[in-house]
Amino acid sequence: MNDYLVKSIDKTKNLRLLTITAKGVVSEAQKRHDLWSASSAVLGRTLVGSLLLAGAELTDKEELTVRLLGNGPVGPAIVTATADLKVKGYVKNPHIALPPKENGHIDVKKAVGQGWFEVTKDLGLKEPYTGQVPIVSGEIAEDFAYYLTKSEQIPSAVGLSVFVNPNNSIGEAGGFMLQALPGASDALIDKTIKRINELPALSTSFLDGMTPEDLARKILGTDCKILEKDDVAFSCDCSKEKYAGILETLKSSQLKDMINEDHGAELICNFCGNKYHYTEDELKEILAKKKDDKDY
């Protein structure tokens, strides 16, 4: 099954739902960062949640960055998602595996720890906007929902799932984001939340072949309307040219050290793990552009 996101609405047009399958996205992140189980669960859920949030809120060339700033062993998770549903991200500590909980599941809450949940939106305005709430759960889905409810005043329910196989490969990944629109009654919201609470585990359902459309009908009812379906992907916009621009911001003395002592430089993208090597000659070209530097 390809990775994609579905937007739907209930028959009363008072509840909006986004559902997603994203095994390929999380698998790509797992391979690029060599993630172990707990790190995969934390980054995977944050990737899936960020795609849902981007699908719900972004248009045109807007983007958002989610920072899960926990003090647990996995460390911070940083994820950026765009309006066209491209996502990239990383965790500080990729090689974390923890003893499973009694039910056999990964202890995501322990992996995340306590701290802050931040969302920065770049909407093309002068200054990006950042909203921040405390991490209230550490299970990540509840933290997305709490952020939406408290920071953006959008009553929401979120479910996120990443199943990690014993060999650290990804068995499935997906989730949903339910948002109450202004006309939603308490009775409608309560009935829908009851449906969600009665669902089997998302991981089991996705492993059994459930699609985002199936999940939408389970949550909103079979009479819901599917509005659109969009592909999602792990994608990083880094390039050798972009990193050359970063090298140009260094002091000339630092570039000289790279040339004379290291005889080159290698830069690694945190988000995707791509490596970019610069030879002495390439560094000299960059240095030549800095002739006007006072420390040249």
Curated annotation (Swiss-Prot):
Intrachain disulfide bonds: 236-238, 269-272
Molecular function GO terms recorded: protein folding chaperone; unfolded protein binding
One CC-aspect GO term: cytoplasm
Modification after translation (UniProt): Under oxidizing conditions two disulfide bonds are formed involving the reactive cysteines. Under reducing conditions zinc is bound to the reactive cysteines and the protein is inactive.
Record keywords, A-Z: Chaperone, Cytoplasm, Disulfide bond, Redox-active center, Zinc
Ranges annotated as spanning the membrane: none
Pfam families: HSP33 (PF01430)
Primary site of residence: cytoplasm
Gene Ontology biological process terms in this record: protein refolding
Top-level taxon of the source organism: Bacteria
Protein location: Cytoplasm
Role played: Redox regulated molecular chaperone. Protects both thermally unfolding and oxidatively damaged proteins from irreversible aggregation. Plays an important role in the bacterial defense system toward oxidative stress.
Family the entry assigns: Belongs to the HSP33 family.
Protein's UniProt name: 33 kDa chaperonin
Organism: Lactobacillus acidophilus (strain ATCC 700396 / NCK56 / N2 / NCFM)
